[in-house]
Amino acid sequence: MRNFELLPKMENPRIVIKKQKRTLEVFDGEKLIKTYAVALGFAPAGDKEKQGDGRTPEGEFYIFTKNDKSKFYLSLGVSYPNSEDARRGLEAKIITQTEYNAIVKAVDAKKAPPQNTYLGGDIYIHGGGAGKADWTWGCVALDNANVKELFDRIPVGTSVKIEP
């Protein structure tokens, strides 16, 4: 789904990832600007529950970092786990109250949530190819040229919605 126009500068960028359609949409406010093909985690059905499950998380997140030294070309860090993931993890006794508190505090401050709990972490939008098969450990992969456009135009703090 490579469009030949580069992603323009935007006033109010946001990202919507539709897992069933295998797409990443970039909006400026309510206006759809561009759609990209993506690959997901190797077990994409359902919401991410824990580290190593191969699922791509669902919910409301934000970009908390950008990495130009990624082993998958370039990457944008997605703020998984969010407060809802933390609540479910606490109820299921997957994480401790201390870990829950740290996640909620980070999310409330729009910082990087802890990436080392049993909920998992290190969810990125990165290069390496959309291809025909889902191959990541839960990340969202694009072709390198497409992730370069996102990397250049999407700032830290941009909202990311991941839908089933």
What are these regions (language model features)?
Residues 18, 39-41, 79, 163:
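A structural detector for beta-sheet-dominated domains
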Residues 25-27:
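Core beta-strand residues in small-molecule sensory/regulatory alpha/beta domains
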Residues 31-42:
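Short Gly/aromatic-enriched secondary-structure transition segments
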Residues 34, 57-61, 72-74, 121:
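A generic structural signal for short beta-strands and their flanking turns/coil linkers
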